[in-house]
Amino acid sequence: AVGKSLKGVTSAIFSMRTALVGVAGVAGFGYLVKSSLNATDSLKKTADKIGTTTEALSALRYAAERTGVQTNTLDMAMQRFTRRTAEAAKGTGEAKGAIKELGLDANKLQRLSLDQQMVSLAGAFGNVTNDADRLRIAFKLFDSEGAALVNTLALGEAGLEEMFGRAKTLGLVMSNQASVGVEKANDSFNDMLSIVKGLKDQFSAALAP
């Protein structure tokens, strides 16, 4: 009877362990998917903050990454550039003189999408042959992040457009419509992870002495 009882306990323990492994596996996969959802959710929120589209920002992130610029640096640079371009269009701000020096019109520049604004800048940068002047202008446009973006702008108009096309071909450009869906999916996934965590806690409590 004792042996039969021990056998039953052992079987129960192994069943519980199998269930725990299954839950852990689901949780592990869940966090992997959650990481991807978080990245897209962050892209959408950052694009909204800057006042641009997820298409433009995701393409710019790819071009920046390929020229050695980290995502957070690019995002901050775009926030500052957007604000400074708006100020320049009103005839004020740090970027006013720099935009004029590049031969661009701040009002026309502001009406373009963010990625096309950068294409215009990249084209104009090609006419600035002195490295010190390039750095100085970049600082006026992007503040302290300007130094990092010099290499991105050095791609030129055609080079930057090529990067955008490559990002699209690789499926790295996220549409606004898709990003809205991801925001909703992220909320639903948070609920699912909470349920999984609850199951793990219940199993752990059941195994406790």
Regions found by a protein language model. Name each.
Residues A1-S11, S15-K34, N38-D41, K45-E55, ...:
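Low-complexity, glycine/alanine/serine/threonine- and acidic/polar-rich repeat/linker tracts characteristic
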